[in-house]
């Protein structure tokens, strides 16, 4: 214990010592100014969005928190945890909801991957290419899908230029991590040629098996128990994208083409596996100013994705190949104010073909299923003095057409209304109520085969009903001056909540599976609270933050929901000026004992942990070029960390102590 205290004291000293450079207030304030939430229909800043609680990561904050997956990057944000199946596959969990209930977007369009099906599937968007990541809840989520009852995450990488750069701009980054001997290189560049905007970006990442504090399995007698290093935790990725736009006074039209390749290992309970992923994506984005009388602008987006991944037993034997071919279109009209109301109306269509073929000649894990969706939506906002009202609605028709099974159709209606009272300048009290409906996915309806990475035999139910969520969210927030704070409480009641009930394998015995996972339904309730206090985040000098969040999810008459986040408390502090930024953060997660009933899950309690991270950034300026040298430290105490939200927590701990060193340049 004394060793840990001394280590922590030394870390604090290293994080803040020697910082004596005179602050250049205007430059720092400009670089730390609140950024616009691109997924918000009204283009609000993060601090202005009390009705739709939001968090935006960008700039150095994003680069310092950047992980190998989306869940790893966002897992310490307020109200957000991570599924953490492996270093290559981890999705964000928002207020206890995950999978298809959390929509993942790239530049406002669906990623087109299959990460919502299962926790072992990666998000189809490279983290190293992201320039901004937005977490959004509330009425704005209705623009992107009725199923996003938990919220949405939008990954922004600016691949289609929307403005003409007067000179070439860009950035590049090189980093090395000690825990896995990992290397990462990313770059992006923009320039213009006349009225043509040009963009290119790419990244390469290669990480080996990562070191762990002790043994991988809680039960040391496990046949796949590793000590000191976790086998099959390697992670490789490469990503390249090109984009171009015609930009004129009337607006713009542009397109981008990208290719993502990713190979990552999965260290399971009784099996080792590898996933080999490839995704090709083509996007079109256009905006026309004042297209008709009474309208401010028309935005049209098109996206086509060809996604596939192969699951390999023991890293060599192909077993199942998942694929998804998807096309999406979005049409948004922004109208001029009508009787003080401002807003958007739009249309969204989605077409996809999903299948999971068993390469050993057995029945498909998921049969070839064609899904179609057509939706209309509207979001409106108006100020009445100190009171702001926000309303939205979405009406959607969804069909699932499987090969050799029952076709299902669903009519969905989702509504949201909120009010914000600015009772004192800089303070706001907000309340939002919403009803949202979600259609079961093809996997929930029609699965019928083994899934080796999760060691389950998945069994769908073609008679599942649509989910209906009723959510209430109350927020209180202070958004000005040095001390800022916010607090939220929420309740979400979900009728016909779809979940996978685990039981000892019967149908899966012949395939060597540990469990049968049967998709079924029950009513569920999720409640929680979040609070955060920050000091001086937008000015030079000392800054700090403390926060806490908690969520409780239950199935009516069946006990706790499985794999729920535990209560967390955290603090961070540091110093910043125009050249230096240093910080130290501590996150404590309580022991998790509110586990699911053994009749629906084999869940076990999770031990408490304390994670300590630190960072130092130093900026050198050469004309219009900035060079930032950085040193990041993660899990400084080399704590054994297991997440209550991870299906493999008893077999796959988080990485041990890790130092990341690198540099990035912006020009």
Where are these regions (language model features)?
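C-terminal beta-signal and adjacent terminal beta-strands/loops
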Residues: 208, 213, 437, 495, ...
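Outer-membrane beta-barrel signature, preferentially recognizing the C-terminal barrel domain
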Residues: 272-291, 322, 407-408, 414-418, ...
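Flexible loop and strand-edge segments within Gram-negative outer membrane beta-barrel domains
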Residues: 233-235, 250-298, 304-326, 361-364, ...
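Periplasmic-side early beta-strands and strand-to-turn transitions of outer-membrane beta-barrels
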Residues: 167-173, 177-180, 184-277
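N-terminal periplasmic accessory domains that precede
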Residues: 70-73, 90-93, 102-105, 120-126, ...
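Short acidic/polar hinge/loop motifs at secondary-structure boundaries
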Residues: 110-139
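Gram-negative outer-membrane beta-barrel transporters
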Residues: 343, 383-389, 482-486, 490-494, ...
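N-terminal periplasmic "start-of-domain" segments of outer-membrane beta-barrel proteins
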Residues: 33-65, 99
